[in-house]
């Protein structure tokens, strides 16, 4: 389990996180929802120790963040971080050299799942297919938790559906997943728990049944309902 306990973070004079507390379990998909700029990505980077927190505590499987935490969690950003001139096969080689947890068999299975070829050059792929490569690079690591920043942002509907299908496949296995998004339409059925953020605080946590009730609503609509009580 990933646990955040009263986490705070300030950038300059702006308080980005104001006592954020929630949990994300293995085998479950937790979604951080909210409009842009409410602290979702900051939370992800804090879990990865890429952004130091000011106060509070973050635990992974009951332990405070340490060097070993990197072996338990992977972060998939919303833009591919590999050199765009690389072929997919070269990106796989890079990952294998850099990460002991790289699983080449799973990488090939994911490549087949998305109908991509190792010889494809990343710079020549569509935005949707680039997002799939980014996803493969994260999912092919043998870790307990996968953090995904806006995996559905700005891609075509077909790519959205393919990526959504991964979450219900054996390729996720029993790993915990945390997703950030500013739009929950079309993915309500994937989520086990949703955490609604605004202005650095958690407005509400939604269970599976409550998430289903948000179908067809925008994040802004959901926020308005919460504020109205």
Language-model segments: what does each one mean?
Residues 79-133:
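ABC-family P-loop ATPase nucleotide-binding domains
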Residues 181-182:
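H-loop/switch region of ABC-family ATPase nucleotide-binding domains
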Residues 48:
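Helix-to-loop junction immediately C-terminal to a conserved catalytic motif
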Residues 33-35:
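The feature captures the beta-strand-to-loop junction immediately N-terminal to the Walker
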Residues 146-150:
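Catalytic Walker B motif of ABC-type/P-loop ATPase nucleotide-binding domains
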Residues 56-69:
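Conserved ABC transporter NBD signature motif
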């Amino acid at each position: 389990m990933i646990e955040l306990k009263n986490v705070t973070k300030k950038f300059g004079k702006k308080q980005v996180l104001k006592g954020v507390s929630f949990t994300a379990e293995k085998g479950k998909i937790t979604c951080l929802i909210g409009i842009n700029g409410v602290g979702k990505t900051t939370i992800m980077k804090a879990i990865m120790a890429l952004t130091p927190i000011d106060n509070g505590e973050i635990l992974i499987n009951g332990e405070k963040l340490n060097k070993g935490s990197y072996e338990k969690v992977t972060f998939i950003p919303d833009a591919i971080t590999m050199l765009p001139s690389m072929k997919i096969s070269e990106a796989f080689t890079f990952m294998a050299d850099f990460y002991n947890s790289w699983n080449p068999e799973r990488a090939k299975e994911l490549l087949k799942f998305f109908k991509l070829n190792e010889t494809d050059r990343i710079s020549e792929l569509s935005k949707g297919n680039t997002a799939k490569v980014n996803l493969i690079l994260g999912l092919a690591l043998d870790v307990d938790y996968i953090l995904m920043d806006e995996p559905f942002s700005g891609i075509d509907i077909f790519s959205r559906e393919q990526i959504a299908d991964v979450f219900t496949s054996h390729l996720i296995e029993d790993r915990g997943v945390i997703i950030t998004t500013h739009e929950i339409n079309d993915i309500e059925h994937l989520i086990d728990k949703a955490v609604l953020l605004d202005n650095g605080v958690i407005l509400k946590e939604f269970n599976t049944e409550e998430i289903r009730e948000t179908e067809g609503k925008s994040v802004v609509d959901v926020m308005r309902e919460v504020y109205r009580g």
